[in-house]
Amino acid sequence: MEAVELARKLQEEATCSICLDYFTDPVMTTCGHNFCRACIQLSWEKARGKKGRRKRKGSFPCPECREMSPQRNLLPNRLLTKVAEMAQQHPGLQKQDLCQEHHEPLKLFCQKDQSPICVVCRESREHRLHRVLPAEEAVQGYKLKLEEDMEYLREQITRTGNLQAREEQSLAEWQGKVKERRERIVLEFEKMNLYLVEEEQRLLQALETEEEETASRLRESVACLDRQGHSLELLLLQLEERSTQGPLQMLQDMKEPLSRKNNVSVQCPEVAPPTRPRTVCRVPGQIEVLRGFLEDVVPDATSAYPYLLLYESRQRRYLGSSPEGSGFCSKDRFVAYPCAVGQTAFSSGRHYWEVGMNITGDALWALGVCRDNVSRKDRVPKCPENGFWVVQLSKGTKYLSTFSALTPVMLMEPPSHMGIFLDFEAGEVSFYSVSDGSHLHTYSQATFPGPLQPFFCLGAPKSGQMVISTVTMWVKG
């Protein structure tokens, strides 16, 4: 107890009575009291502003004893500076160990206010009715609680670390999978590019072989005809020479030249030259790429030919001829041909749609695009000059008619499933056989004067059906 009391007394001696904190740059007045230099100067600054006269100019009252002390006579107390430093460093003399109000040790703990108090505070009106514990007992309880909280936090830190490690592992695995997929994409495209190059070379080689075979036959025909021409020219010269001879000379031995003339006959080529190469332009995977621009094309019932019936079945939209007809002819309706257009007009971008044909007999059909203001009342040729970019075919034939090629496109088989691709900005309309992926025809470098609509045409009533859909599905039986 004597050590505690001694420590308390030492703490009191090292404490400034103005700020109630350990001395900072302590100074001593002429009356022998000590204060922090900043505290005494602030106190005197306040006193200077108060009314009344001081007994001596430049003197101020001591905050402890009120004795007047000249300001210039403040003396530094270096010994007290050392004492204050020792008190601050001593673990038993920390400022928080004493009550700031009563300067008594904080030996108790108020549970309601959750703060340490001294014995004087315990008897005060503020804490008299509160539950108070000895500080050591409260410390033990809080130590247990802090240990529980720290253990919980340690568990959470461990859990967080495990989660972080798991997420880092997931991140690394994800990046590894993405890297593997990226490498796979690059590899597959390299393989596809190599395959496309090889396929291109194969098609070009086949086309070159076909060109050489046909050209060889044609060259042989040219050479044969050239030989026949020379023989005919030689015979003509002989006959012209004989015709200029005298009568007796002309009549001599006429049997031989006349017999040669009678034996002359021009031999025509045995095989007619093909109108188009047999080698088909077929790019693997092109249809799948074009389907990235797939449109859900819906035929417009308000403008369709009166004898066309539009109906849906299982998400498919069918365009088929109907002999009954609607009997209603608006100004926008096709009346010259069994035609219809799509509801949506395209004025930019790339668009692709597919049409299946279930055509009967030798009916004529046509597919493509047309201007949104084409003539619908008159029978006009379906050519670009009239606003049509279409291909057409009579079922049973193998020649697809176009209006930009001098000769029709020869087909191995009439297509039953067509794909139409419009690139508005490029001025191109391309046609494909979806069944085998072959390219059939392209209108290129076209100048479209306005919006374009998908165009469908059946040659006559009872000619069959067109299946217009974005997805073709069937169940294998």
Curated annotation (Swiss-Prot):
Amino-acid positions noted as binding Zn(2+) in the UniProt annotation, renumbered to this chain: 99, 102, 121, 127
UniProt tissue specificity: Almost exclusively in the testis.
UniProt zinc finger (B box-type) residues: 94-135
InterPro entries named among the record's database cross-references: B30.2/SPRY (IPR001870), B30.2/SPRY_sf (IPR043136), Butyrophylin_SPRY (IPR003879), ConA-like_dom_sf (IPR013320), PRY (IPR006574), SPRY_dom (IPR003877), TRIM/RBCC (IPR050143), TRIM17_PRY/SPRY (IPR035687)
Signal peptide: none
PTM section of the record: Auto-ubiquitinated.
Highest taxon above the source species: Eukaryota
Annotated Pfam families: SPRY (PF00622), zf-B_box (PF00643), zf-RING_UBOX (PF13445)
ZnF segments: RING-type: 16-66
SUPFAM superfamilies: B-box zinc-binding domain (SSF57845), Concanavalin A-like lectins/glucanases (SSF49899), RING/U-box (SSF57850)
This protein's UniProt keywords: Coiled coil, Cytoplasm, Lysosome, Metal-binding, Transferase, Ubl conjugation, Ubl conjugation pathway, Zinc, Zinc-finger
PROSITE patterns per record: B302_SPRY, ZF_BBOX, ZF_RING_1, ZF_RING_2
Domain B30.2/SPRY positions: 277-475
Pathway: Protein modification; protein ubiquitination
BP GO annotations: autophagy; innate immune response; protein autoubiquitination; regulation of gene expression; regulation of protein localization
EC number: 2.3.2.27
Subcellular location, record wording: Cytoplasm; Lysosome
Catalytic reaction(s) noted: S-ubiquitinyl-[E2 ubiquitin-conjugating enzyme]-L-cysteine + [acceptor protein]-L-lysine = [E2 ubiquitin-conjugating enzyme]-L-cysteine + N(6)-ubiquitinyl-[acceptor protein]-L-lysine
PANTHER family given in the database record: E3 UBIQUITIN-PROTEIN LIGASE TRIM
Role: E3 ubiquitin ligase that plays important roles in the regulation of neuronal apoptosis, selective autophagy or cell proliferation. Stimulates the degradation of kinetochore ZW10 interacting protein ZWINT in a proteasome-dependent manner, leading to negative regulation of cell proliferation. Inhibits autophagic degradation of diverse known targets while contributing to autophagy of midbodies. Autophagy-inhibitory activity involves MCL1, which TRIM17 assembles into complexes with the key autophagy regulator BECN1.
Family to which this protein belongs: Belongs to the TRIM/RBCC family.
Protein known as: E3 ubiquitin-protein ligase TRIM17
Organism phylogeny: Eukaryota, Metazoa, Chordata, Craniata, Vertebrata
